[in-house]
From Swiss-Prot:
Name of a matching Pfam family: MdoG
GO biological process: beta-glucan biosynthetic process
GO cellular component, one term: outer membrane-bounded periplasmic space
Taxonomy, superkingdom: Bacteria
UniProt entry keywords in alphabetical sequence: Periplasm, Signal
Signal peptide as annotated in the record: 1-26
InterPro entries: Gal_mutarotase_sf_dom, GH-type_carb-bd, Glucan_biosyn_MdoD, Glucan_biosyn_MdoG/MdoD, Glucan_biosyn_MdoG_C, Ig-like_fold, Ig_E-set
Family: Belongs to the OpgD/OpgG family.
Protein name: Glucans biosynthesis protein D
Entry-linked PANTHER family: GLUCANS BIOSYNTHESIS PROTEIN, GLUCANS BIOSYNTHESIS PROTEIN D
Pathway listed: Glycan metabolism; osmoregulated periplasmic glucan (OPG) biosynthesis
Amino acid sequence: MQRRDFIRNASLALAAFGLPSLPACAASRSGQMGLRRLGQPQPFDFATLKGQARALAQAPYKSHKRVLPGRLEGLDWDQYQSIGYRQDHALWADQPGKFQAKFFHLGLYFHSPVRMFDVVDGKAQELAYDGAAFNYGKSGIKDGELPADLGFAGFRLNTRKDTDRDFAAFLGASYFRAVGKEGQYGQSARGLAIDTGMGKPEEFPDFIAYYLEQPSADSDTIVVYGLLDSPSVAGAYRFAITNGDVLLMDIDSALYPRKAIERLGIAPCTSMYQVGENDRRMAWDWRPEIHDTDGLSLWTGAGEWIWRPLLNPRNLRFNMFVDRNPRGFGLLQRDRNFDHYQDDGVFYEKRPCLWVEPKGEWGEGSVQLVEIPTVDETFDNIVAFWNPKEKPQPGQELLVGYRLYWGAEPPARPPLAHCVASRTGLGGVVGKKREYFSWRFAVDFEGGELARLIDKGEVEAVVEASRGRVEIVSARPLREINGYRAMFDLVPPEGSTEQIDIRLFLRSGGKTLTETWLYQYTPPPAGAPERTLY
């Protein structure tokens, strides 16, 4: 299956292979309200889950895909969205803790069941599907007409104080997402990415079971375990989720490859970028900007801070940023101005940043960025992940730990000035005839020491390009933001449409003042409108 088809259709393959099989008849309420429990509680911890993943990897992969009843297959988006979960069936609704869990119904794009377990005092018990736990809304489905053992598609978490608004959700393949204090969903994370952006179909691992650990009454953290499976790898995950203004997920994972993996993506972030200040190739919409995030931020092992604005390219674009023991990376939404989006329905200015902080040393590898052309904001066309230099091999155990931060600001910020806007347009000198094609870049920086240098005029822009030539370079104060604007024109080689890598930073007296701004520009082909204006 092609990546675009998968993301649009979300034909997810899930099943119960490798988990203890419990008969549906062995069900009980275990003295709790809500869903029935299947079988007897079994001892469970992260080591147990690793053992399950290891056993999965040692056996041939079996597809988990199932065919849904026709009534569920035929649901449209509005019908599926109208199916709600009843509050009186929420997991832990009768417990004194701060958190509850509710479950997603199968249907629409979500075709295969995921097993759900409740973990209490170190023992796990499977939760039975119950059609009576759902309100079927406008779907046309009546309680009792679906199979009694149908299963669930995923789950979401909410607080006891706000049962109508969830702060994290796990739904579809290995996708999950969360929100900060803004309460607005945006980009997603995944358990794993395999062969993303290559000349062959991408592989999408599935979480085939989740174990939700009942938190203590005073705990601010909820722990979730996930069992992952795919043709290439099986894995065990532990998520310690702490809700707050910036939501934290502390993740430990153990991966067990079935076969060699050519491109393994650790801590993948998945986002959407259609049009923004720097890239208006698809600017046919009435809204000035449409994106979940506007840039990739990197904090390298050597301590350099890098900002790479995102693009909606004409063709699939792949970039790798080689590093050793990275300190962090993430897809960020730095532009928080409603006027720049004008969308009062999906609120792009409130979309969360997602920052990845490695635990321990990750060694050699690269942060890889995949940008895919899109004309549709419902298609996630941006992926960023860590790819280890050493390729995983069958029989290995790969242990990886990291933290994910979801919120308006990442937990780590460069001590230097940072980029707040990147704009592009036709180059040349206003009022003078253009003798050749050039492209203008205007990059705004704020923070660091820039504010105190505004009146001193000692700041210069340092620009490098991999081909072509750079001209009309300037760095001037921008008092509206207490920062500086760097401007320059790039003149591509005559007739060339090869990509050009650009590097920019500001300095004063030999001292670096800003993070490093990187860009990849593709000159337009002959005959393009911007080529005819000189």
